[in-house]
């Protein structure tokens, strides 16, 4: 018996040694070992001194570039910049600003923020931070932001130029956490119709949305327009929380699946505050990822009408992998699928072709005409309630197509915008008339109804354009005139009030919003969906 156990032990030991040797042999011949040896050889044997960190970073970037367009590497600084808007706050002095002629112009101090508390006003120009001149020296916006931001409770000394005051005004601002809002606008767009615009899906989005929804319902809202145009996505959980507001209990919102990630399903809890009202969802070619999750769920359950243009088509699940130095790899581990089984992700034969997709879609006429878009039978799916046909193959195809309106966007208008003439002229007007306008228009509604951009203001805009190298074109000016008036009015509304009022004005030219309002005038809402069966 003793010999038998001893022999069995020898056999077990032998096989464990063989297994270990096999494992070691496998590692020694693995691609990972090959990479390690190459890096070791370069670091220790190369003729000149090398930057190992940079070499490794570039190797990681190259490797990820062979996979898909959304598997990426970010250095520690990029990780910080990427996370701030999604976390819902950052630490700084609390101002909205624009750069006007190499000078930081305060658009609005954040309500209740550190700058407002010490008396900094809209229209102030920050000239110095500590002892460093930042005005008129062509300092980059990123460099200025680095000087203004800092840890909570730290202090920064500013010198400010204020209209009507000769000397520079000194301010000491105690930095604090500053909220970053993901809702741009929330207002009653028409009797009983509310409007909410979400610019990203962040940690605070659901909380912001519920607050906005409750406020609109108190004002008598029965129907809702949810604007996701230009929304590039964000957190999956935020998208699920928003979709939950519209769907019934146990209705599937989205599922994910990948090679090493078994199917994972996310369902509505049935606790939403807007499960019954009429819903319009607006999307365009820049609506992506989390926006497409919400839109796909609404469409697949026939819960609302989708209006606009085919969305971007980003349906890859990224897992963030934190590296020891604070950098991060975002690795694609699965794909998103809508409740009907549609894959949101568009094809990616090569990264170059993928990056040119929107240009290709425009050149093929997809932005102008629904008839230019064709789907094979293999990409047709059925919705859950009404068995309508919806389409896969990348992005969400709207129920009602709205082409891009290019009639007002002339080359002259584009140059006024791109060269900064529109912004510079508007800064001049707001500087000269802020106090007068706030006295004349006691509320935004008064401003919205009565304010008009005058011929003198337009003449100043044209003159500013000429100063900045924009060649005047009478025909193109006349063609773009309605849009120029509206944009100028919207920018002034933003500076006198906030982004909510900006969108209240600028949305008058939004064709998708017009279409949604037109559809909501029809009493048979389900009929709108059945027409697209």
Language model: regions and residue ranges:
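PDZ/PDZ-like peptide-tail recognition elements
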Residues: 58, 69-108
